Protein backbone atom coordinates (compact mmCIF):
# COMPACT_ATOMS: atom_id res chain seq x y z
CA UNK A 1 0.00 0.00 0.00
CA UNK A 2 1.01 3.61 -0.39
CA UNK A 3 2.50 5.70 2.39
CA UNK A 4 -0.38 7.44 4.20
CA UNK A 5 1.69 10.59 4.63
CA UNK A 6 2.49 10.61 0.90
CA UNK A 7 -1.20 10.35 -0.02
CA UNK A 8 -2.08 13.15 2.43
CA UNK A 9 0.57 15.53 1.11
CA UNK A 10 0.46 14.57 -2.59
CA UNK A 11 -3.22 13.97 -3.42
CA UNK A 12 -2.90 15.31 -6.98
CA UNK A 13 0.00 12.95 -7.74
CA UNK A 14 -2.08 10.01 -6.52
CA UNK A 15 -5.16 11.18 -8.45
CA UNK A 16 -3.09 11.41 -11.64
CA UNK A 17 -1.71 7.90 -11.06
CA UNK A 18 -5.25 6.56 -10.55
CA UNK A 19 -6.32 8.26 -13.77
CA UNK A 20 -3.44 6.68 -15.72
CA UNK A 21 -4.40 3.28 -14.33
CA UNK A 22 -8.12 3.71 -15.17
CA UNK A 23 -8.79 3.02 -11.49
CA UNK A 24 -12.27 3.72 -10.13
CA UNK A 25 -10.98 4.36 -6.60
CA UNK A 26 -12.12 7.81 -5.44
CA UNK A 27 -9.71 9.82 -3.35
CA UNK A 28 -12.26 12.55 -2.55
CA UNK A 29 -13.92 10.68 0.33
CA UNK A 30 -10.47 9.82 1.68
CA UNK A 31 -9.42 13.48 1.63
CA UNK A 32 -12.68 14.54 3.30
CA UNK A 33 -12.01 12.02 6.05
CA UNK A 34 -8.46 13.32 6.33
CA UNK A 35 -9.79 16.84 6.90
CA UNK A 36 -12.20 15.54 9.55
CA UNK A 37 -9.38 13.52 11.14
CA UNK A 38 -7.22 16.64 11.41
CA UNK A 39 -10.04 18.60 13.07
CA UNK A 40 -10.76 15.79 15.53
CA UNK A 41 -7.06 15.40 16.31
CA UNK A 42 -6.78 19.12 17.04
CA UNK A 43 -9.86 18.93 19.28
CA UNK A 44 -8.50 15.90 21.14
CA UNK A 45 -5.14 17.56 21.72
CA UNK A 46 -6.84 20.75 22.94
CA UNK A 47 -9.02 18.82 25.38
CA UNK A 48 -6.03 16.84 26.64
CA UNK A 49 -4.17 20.08 27.26
CA UNK A 50 -7.20 21.43 29.13
CA UNK A 51 -7.42 18.20 31.15
CA UNK A 52 -3.77 18.52 32.12
CA UNK A 53 -4.30 22.13 33.22
CA UNK A 54 -7.38 21.19 35.28
CA UNK A 55 -5.52 18.24 36.79
CA UNK A 56 -2.73 20.53 37.92
CA UNK A 57 -5.27 22.92 39.43
CA UNK A 58 -6.98 20.04 41.28
CA UNK A 59 -3.62 19.03 42.71
CA UNK A 60 -2.88 22.59 43.79
CA UNK A 61 -6.27 23.00 45.50
CA UNK A 62 -6.00 19.69 47.33
CA UNK A 63 -2.53 20.65 48.50
CA UNK A 64 -3.93 23.84 50.03
CA UNK A 65 -7.06 22.20 51.46
CA UNK A 66 -9.38 23.92 48.98
CA UNK A 67 -12.53 22.44 47.41
CA UNK A 68 -11.79 20.76 44.06
CA UNK A 69 -14.99 18.76 43.52
CA UNK A 70 -16.30 20.92 40.68
CA UNK A 71 -12.97 20.72 38.87
CA UNK A 72 -12.87 16.94 39.31
CA UNK A 73 -16.32 16.66 37.70
CA UNK A 74 -15.17 18.93 34.91
CA UNK A 75 -12.06 16.78 34.39
CA UNK A 76 -14.21 13.64 34.16
CA UNK A 77 -16.41 15.29 31.55
CA UNK A 78 -13.35 16.30 29.56
CA UNK A 79 -11.99 12.76 29.86
CA UNK A 80 -15.24 11.31 28.51
CA UNK A 81 -15.21 13.78 25.60
CA UNK A 82 -11.63 12.76 24.81
CA UNK A 83 -12.61 9.07 24.83
CA UNK A 84 -15.61 9.68 22.54
CA UNK A 85 -13.52 11.72 20.12
CA UNK A 86 -10.69 9.14 20.14
CA UNK A 87 -13.22 6.39 19.38
CA UNK A 88 -14.51 8.43 16.44
CA UNK A 89 -10.95 9.15 15.37
CA UNK A 90 -10.18 5.43 15.42
CA UNK A 91 -13.20 4.70 13.21
CA UNK A 92 -12.14 7.35 10.69
CA UNK A 93 -8.54 6.09 10.61
CA UNK A 94 -9.78 2.52 10.13
CA UNK A 95 -11.97 3.68 7.24
CA UNK A 96 -9.04 5.58 5.71
CA UNK A 97 -6.82 2.52 6.00
CA UNK A 98 -9.48 0.46 4.19
CA UNK A 99 -9.36 2.98 1.31
CA UNK A 100 -5.54 2.78 1.32
CA UNK A 101 -5.77 -0.98 0.77
CA UNK A 102 -7.86 -0.30 -2.36
CA UNK A 103 -5.44 2.23 -3.93
CA UNK A 104 -3.11 0.59 -6.50
CA UNK A 105 0.60 1.25 -6.71
CA UNK A 106 1.87 4.36 -8.48
CA UNK A 107 3.40 3.48 -11.88
CA UNK A 108 7.10 4.18 -12.34
CA UNK A 109 7.86 7.12 -14.63
CA UNK A 110 9.24 4.74 -17.30
CA UNK A 111 5.95 2.81 -17.63
CA UNK A 112 4.15 3.48 -20.96
CA UNK A 113 0.93 5.46 -20.45
CA UNK A 114 -2.12 3.83 -22.00
CA UNK A 115 -5.62 2.52 -21.37
CA UNK A 116 -5.04 -1.22 -21.75
CA UNK A 117 -2.85 -3.97 -23.22
CA UNK A 118 -3.01 -2.32 -26.64
CA UNK A 119 -0.65 0.33 -25.24
CA UNK A 120 1.94 -2.22 -24.09
CA UNK A 121 5.34 -1.67 -25.70
CA UNK A 122 7.53 -4.38 -27.23
CA UNK A 123 11.00 -4.11 -25.70
CA UNK A 124 12.78 -6.93 -27.55
CA UNK A 125 12.26 -10.28 -29.22
CA UNK A 126 14.34 -13.45 -29.21
CA UNK A 127 14.28 -16.28 -31.72
CA UNK A 128 12.26 -16.71 -34.90
CA UNK A 129 8.87 -18.46 -34.95
CA UNK A 130 9.17 -21.77 -36.77
CA UNK A 131 7.67 -22.24 -40.22
CA UNK A 132 5.81 -25.56 -40.49
CA UNK A 133 5.42 -27.60 -43.68
CA UNK A 134 2.31 -29.15 -42.12
CA UNK A 135 -0.68 -27.81 -40.19
CA UNK A 136 0.51 -27.53 -36.56
CA UNK A 137 -1.79 -28.82 -33.84
CA UNK A 138 -2.71 -27.13 -30.59
CA UNK A 139 -0.92 -28.44 -27.49
CA UNK A 140 -4.08 -30.04 -26.10
CA UNK A 141 -4.61 -31.96 -29.35
CA UNK A 142 -0.99 -33.15 -29.28
CA UNK A 143 -1.25 -34.12 -25.62
CA UNK A 144 -4.40 -36.14 -26.16
CA UNK A 145 -3.05 -37.88 -29.28
CA UNK A 146 0.14 -38.87 -27.42
CA UNK A 147 -1.92 -39.86 -24.35
CA UNK A 148 0.17 -37.63 -22.07
CA UNK A 149 -2.60 -35.14 -21.18
CA UNK A 150 -6.09 -36.19 -20.10
CA UNK A 151 -8.55 -33.33 -19.79
CA UNK A 152 -11.72 -35.43 -19.99
CA UNK A 153 -10.94 -37.62 -16.97
CA UNK A 154 -9.75 -34.61 -14.97
CA UNK A 155 -13.11 -33.02 -15.77
CA UNK A 156 -14.85 -36.15 -14.52
CA UNK A 157 -12.83 -36.22 -11.31
CA UNK A 158 -12.79 -32.50 -10.53
CA UNK A 159 -14.25 -30.26 -13.23
CA UNK A 160 -13.25 -27.83 -15.94
CA UNK A 161 -9.74 -26.31 -16.07
CA UNK A 162 -7.98 -29.31 -14.52
CA UNK A 163 -5.63 -31.84 -16.13
CA UNK A 164 -4.13 -35.27 -15.62
CA UNK A 165 -0.50 -35.42 -16.81
CA UNK A 166 0.42 -39.01 -17.74
CA UNK A 167 3.58 -40.91 -18.63
CA UNK A 168 6.08 -38.68 -20.40
CA UNK A 169 3.70 -35.75 -19.90
CA UNK A 170 4.09 -36.05 -16.13
CA UNK A 171 7.84 -36.58 -16.52
CA UNK A 172 8.10 -33.51 -18.78
CA UNK A 173 6.38 -31.39 -16.13
CA UNK A 174 8.72 -32.74 -13.43
CA UNK A 175 11.78 -32.30 -15.67
CA UNK A 176 10.91 -28.65 -16.29
CA UNK A 177 10.53 -27.97 -12.57
CA UNK A 178 13.94 -29.50 -11.81
CA UNK A 179 15.58 -27.80 -14.80
CA UNK A 180 14.30 -24.35 -13.81
CA UNK A 181 15.19 -24.72 -10.13
CA UNK A 182 18.67 -25.95 -11.03
CA UNK A 183 19.31 -23.03 -13.37
CA UNK A 184 18.06 -20.39 -10.95
CA UNK A 185 19.89 -21.93 -7.98
CA UNK A 186 23.12 -21.82 -10.00
CA UNK A 187 22.60 -18.05 -10.32
CA UNK A 188 22.43 -17.56 -6.57
CA UNK A 189 18.73 -17.92 -5.87
CA UNK A 190 18.14 -19.83 -2.63
CA UNK A 191 15.52 -22.51 -3.18
CA UNK A 192 12.42 -22.54 -0.95
CA UNK A 193 9.64 -25.12 -0.80
CA UNK A 194 6.75 -23.13 0.70
CA UNK A 195 3.40 -24.02 2.28
CA UNK A 196 0.53 -24.20 -0.19
CA UNK A 197 -1.88 -22.58 2.28
CA UNK A 198 -1.55 -19.17 3.92
CA UNK A 199 -3.77 -17.13 6.22
CA UNK A 200 -5.57 -13.89 5.42
CA UNK A 201 -2.82 -11.56 6.68
CA UNK A 202 -0.35 -13.11 4.24
CA UNK A 203 -2.74 -12.57 1.32
CA UNK A 204 -3.20 -8.96 2.44
CA UNK A 205 0.57 -8.54 2.71
CA UNK A 206 1.21 -9.29 -0.97
CA UNK A 207 -1.92 -7.50 -2.17
CA UNK A 208 -4.25 -10.33 -3.21
CA UNK A 209 -6.69 -9.30 -0.47
CA UNK A 210 -8.98 -7.57 0.08
CA UNK A 211 -9.40 -6.50 -3.57
CA UNK A 212 -9.16 -9.88 -5.32
CA UNK A 213 -10.80 -12.25 -2.86
CA UNK A 214 -13.17 -13.61 -5.52
CA UNK A 215 -10.15 -14.96 -7.42
CA UNK A 216 -8.87 -16.90 -4.40
CA UNK A 217 -9.74 -20.38 -3.15
CA UNK A 218 -10.61 -20.20 0.56
CA UNK A 219 -10.63 -23.30 2.74
CA UNK A 220 -14.14 -23.42 4.20
CA UNK A 221 -14.38 -23.04 7.97
CA UNK A 222 -10.81 -21.74 8.29
CA UNK A 223 -8.80 -18.57 7.74
CA UNK A 224 -6.64 -20.40 5.17
CA UNK A 225 -6.38 -19.69 1.45
CA UNK A 226 -4.77 -21.88 -1.22
CA UNK A 227 -1.88 -19.89 -2.66
CA UNK A 228 -2.34 -18.31 -6.12
CA UNK A 229 1.46 -18.15 -6.47
CA UNK A 230 4.57 -18.88 -4.38
CA UNK A 231 5.04 -15.11 -4.25
CA UNK A 232 2.60 -15.03 -1.32
CA UNK A 233 4.32 -17.39 1.16
CA UNK A 234 7.87 -16.52 0.08
CA UNK A 235 7.37 -12.75 0.39
CA UNK A 236 5.61 -13.20 3.72
CA UNK A 237 8.53 -15.24 5.08
CA UNK A 238 9.94 -11.89 6.19
CA UNK A 239 6.67 -10.25 7.25
CA UNK A 240 6.98 -8.10 10.41
CA UNK A 241 10.78 -8.41 10.31
CA UNK A 242 13.62 -5.88 10.29
CA UNK A 243 16.53 -7.18 8.22
CA UNK A 244 20.13 -6.06 8.46
CA UNK A 245 21.78 -4.38 5.47
CA UNK A 246 24.26 -7.22 5.01
CA UNK A 247 21.35 -9.63 4.43
CA UNK A 248 20.29 -7.76 1.29
CA UNK A 249 19.69 -8.46 -1.47
CA UNK A 250 17.81 -11.72 -0.86
CA UNK A 251 17.02 -13.89 -3.90
CA UNK A 252 14.71 -16.91 -3.63
CA UNK A 253 13.37 -19.39 -6.16
CA UNK A 254 10.42 -21.57 -5.27
CA UNK A 255 8.40 -24.30 -6.93
CA UNK A 256 4.75 -24.57 -5.94
CA UNK A 257 1.37 -25.59 -7.17
CA UNK A 258 -0.83 -22.51 -7.72
CA UNK A 259 -4.60 -22.27 -7.31
CA UNK A 260 -6.76 -19.62 -9.00
CA UNK A 261 -10.51 -19.29 -9.32
CA UNK A 262 -10.14 -17.29 -12.57
CA UNK A 263 -13.42 -15.57 -11.70
CA UNK A 264 -13.11 -13.01 -14.49
CA UNK A 265 -12.06 -15.46 -17.21
CA UNK A 266 -15.30 -17.22 -18.11
CA UNK A 267 -15.16 -18.38 -21.71
CA UNK A 268 -11.45 -17.58 -22.16
CA UNK A 269 -8.93 -20.35 -22.94
CA UNK A 270 -11.39 -23.04 -21.92
CA UNK A 271 -9.33 -25.77 -23.59
CA UNK A 272 -5.80 -26.79 -22.75
CA UNK A 273 -3.20 -25.70 -20.22
CA UNK A 274 -3.21 -21.93 -20.70
CA UNK A 275 -5.71 -21.03 -17.97
CA UNK A 276 -6.09 -23.68 -15.26
CA UNK A 277 -7.51 -23.60 -11.74
CA UNK A 278 -4.42 -25.56 -10.59
CA UNK A 279 -1.01 -25.31 -12.21
CA UNK A 280 2.67 -25.53 -11.33
CA UNK A 281 5.09 -22.63 -11.41
CA UNK A 282 8.64 -21.75 -10.44
CA UNK A 283 8.71 -18.29 -8.87
CA UNK A 284 11.57 -15.84 -8.41
CA UNK A 285 11.31 -13.46 -5.43
CA UNK A 286 13.71 -10.67 -4.51
CA UNK A 287 14.14 -8.33 -1.53
CA UNK A 288 16.30 -5.35 -2.47
CA UNK A 289 17.65 -1.97 -1.44
CA UNK A 290 15.28 0.72 -2.81
CA UNK A 291 18.05 2.37 -4.83
CA UNK A 292 18.90 -0.93 -6.58
CA UNK A 293 15.45 -2.37 -7.22
CA UNK A 294 15.21 -1.40 -10.90
CA UNK A 295 18.57 -2.99 -11.63
CA UNK A 296 17.24 -6.06 -9.82
CA UNK A 297 14.13 -6.00 -12.04
CA UNK A 298 16.26 -6.06 -15.19
CA UNK A 299 18.37 -8.97 -13.93
CA UNK A 300 15.30 -10.89 -12.73
CA UNK A 301 13.73 -10.49 -16.18
CA UNK A 302 16.93 -11.71 -17.85
CA UNK A 303 16.99 -14.73 -15.53
CA UNK A 304 13.46 -15.66 -16.58
CA UNK A 305 14.38 -15.08 -20.24
CA UNK A 306 17.39 -17.38 -19.95
CA UNK A 307 15.08 -20.37 -19.39
CA UNK A 308 13.24 -19.68 -22.65
CA UNK A 309 16.56 -19.22 -24.45
CA UNK A 310 17.94 -22.55 -23.20
CA UNK A 311 14.71 -24.21 -24.28
CA UNK A 312 15.06 -22.40 -27.64
CA UNK A 313 11.52 -21.05 -27.53
CA UNK A 314 10.86 -17.78 -29.42
CA UNK A 315 9.52 -15.02 -27.20
CA UNK A 316 9.16 -11.30 -26.80
CA UNK A 317 9.42 -8.94 -23.82
CA UNK A 318 6.60 -6.44 -23.33
CA UNK A 319 6.59 -3.41 -21.02
CA UNK A 320 3.07 -3.20 -19.62
CA UNK A 321 1.21 0.10 -19.89
CA UNK A 322 -0.32 1.93 -16.94
CA UNK A 323 -3.75 0.57 -17.86
CA UNK A 324 -2.57 -3.06 -17.97
CA UNK A 325 -0.33 -2.93 -14.90
CA UNK A 326 -1.16 -5.23 -11.98
CA UNK A 327 -2.62 -3.70 -8.81
CA UNK A 328 0.56 -4.03 -6.73
CA UNK A 329 3.15 -3.35 -9.43
CA UNK A 330 5.11 -0.17 -10.15
CA UNK A 331 6.58 -1.67 -13.32
CA UNK A 332 6.12 -5.00 -15.09
CA UNK A 333 7.69 -6.82 -18.01
CA UNK A 334 5.68 -9.68 -19.50
CA UNK A 335 7.51 -12.47 -21.30
CA UNK A 336 5.33 -13.86 -24.08
CA UNK A 337 6.20 -17.15 -25.75
CA UNK A 338 5.26 -17.99 -29.34
CA UNK A 339 2.39 -20.48 -29.65
CA UNK A 340 1.83 -21.67 -33.24
CA UNK A 341 -1.80 -22.73 -32.61
CA UNK A 342 -2.67 -19.15 -31.62
CA UNK A 343 -0.31 -17.72 -34.26
CA UNK A 344 0.73 -15.20 -31.65
CA UNK A 345 2.71 -14.69 -28.45
CA UNK A 346 1.11 -15.59 -25.11
CA UNK A 347 2.21 -14.61 -21.60
CA UNK A 348 4.44 -17.12 -19.83
CA UNK A 349 5.99 -14.86 -17.17
CA UNK A 350 5.39 -11.51 -15.48
CA UNK A 351 8.39 -9.82 -13.84
CA UNK A 352 7.50 -6.94 -11.53
CA UNK A 353 8.96 -4.37 -9.17
CA UNK A 354 6.53 -3.49 -6.39
CA UNK A 355 8.89 -0.94 -4.82
CA UNK A 356 7.78 -0.62 -1.15
CA UNK A 357 4.08 -1.34 -1.85
CA UNK A 358 4.10 -4.92 -0.51
CA UNK A 359 6.74 -4.16 2.12
CA UNK A 360 4.43 -1.57 3.73
CA UNK A 361 1.51 -3.98 3.78
CA UNK A 362 3.65 -6.79 5.20
CA UNK A 363 5.85 -4.47 7.31
CA UNK A 364 9.16 -5.75 5.92
CA UNK A 365 11.98 -3.33 6.74
CA UNK A 366 15.76 -3.12 6.95
CA UNK A 367 18.42 -1.07 8.73
CA UNK A 368 21.32 0.45 6.80
CA UNK A 369 23.39 0.49 10.02
CA UNK A 370 22.96 -1.27 13.41
CA UNK A 371 21.18 1.66 15.09
CA UNK A 372 19.72 3.32 12.01
CA UNK A 373 16.01 3.99 11.60
CA UNK A 374 14.29 1.06 9.84
CA UNK A 375 13.28 1.64 6.21
CA UNK A 376 10.93 -0.27 3.93
CA UNK A 377 12.80 -2.39 1.39
CA UNK A 378 11.61 -3.12 -2.16
CA UNK A 379 10.15 -6.46 -3.25
CA UNK A 380 10.18 -7.99 -6.72
CA UNK A 381 9.05 -11.24 -8.27
CA UNK A 382 8.58 -13.02 -11.54
CA UNK A 383 7.62 -16.38 -12.97
CA UNK A 384 10.62 -18.38 -13.89
CA UNK A 385 8.47 -19.95 -15.48
CA UNK A 386 4.84 -21.11 -15.48
CA UNK A 387 5.26 -24.85 -16.07
CA UNK A 388 2.00 -25.68 -17.85
CA UNK A 389 2.43 -22.88 -20.36
CA UNK A 390 6.02 -24.01 -20.94
CA UNK A 391 4.74 -27.53 -21.64
CA UNK A 392 2.24 -26.00 -24.09
CA UNK A 393 5.00 -24.08 -25.87
CA UNK A 394 7.26 -27.14 -26.12
CA UNK A 395 4.52 -29.40 -27.48
CA UNK A 396 3.52 -26.85 -30.12
CA UNK A 397 6.94 -25.56 -31.18
CA UNK A 398 8.68 -28.97 -31.17
CA UNK A 399 5.94 -31.06 -32.81
CA UNK A 400 6.89 -33.16 -35.84
CA UNK A 401 4.87 -34.12 -38.90
CA UNK A 402 4.75 -37.77 -37.73
CA UNK A 403 3.01 -36.76 -34.48
CA UNK A 404 6.03 -37.02 -32.22
CA UNK A 405 7.43 -34.14 -30.16
CA UNK A 406 11.16 -33.51 -30.08
CA UNK A 407 12.51 -32.85 -26.57
CA UNK A 408 14.57 -29.63 -26.25
CA UNK A 409 18.28 -30.43 -25.86
CA UNK A 410 18.45 -28.75 -22.45
CA UNK A 411 15.77 -31.12 -21.13
CA UNK A 412 17.07 -34.38 -22.60
CA UNK A 413 19.36 -35.12 -19.62
CA UNK A 414 16.36 -34.67 -17.31
CA UNK A 415 13.88 -36.64 -19.40
CA UNK A 416 16.23 -39.32 -20.75
CA UNK A 417 14.65 -39.36 -24.23
CA UNK A 418 14.95 -37.35 -27.44
CA UNK A 419 11.32 -37.70 -28.49
CA UNK A 420 7.91 -38.01 -26.90
CA UNK A 421 5.80 -40.43 -28.88
Curated annotation (Swiss-Prot):
Domain notes: Consists of two distinct domains, a catalytic core and a N-terminal extension that is involved in tRNA binding.
InterPro entries: aa-tRNA-synt_IIb, aa-tRNA-synth_II, aa-tRNA-synth_II/BPL/LPL, Ser-tRNA-ligase_type_1, Ser-tRNA-synth_1_N, SerRS_1_N_sf, SerRS_core, tRNA-bd_arm
PROSITE patterns: AA_TRNA_LIGASE_II
NCBIfam families with a match to the protein in the record: serS
Name under which the protein is recorded: Serine--tRNA ligase
Compartments it resides in: Cytoplasm
Stated family: Belongs to the class-II aminoacyl-tRNA synthetase family. Type-1 seryl-tRNA synthetase subfamily.
GO biological process terms on file: selenocysteine biosynthetic process; seryl-tRNA aminoacylation
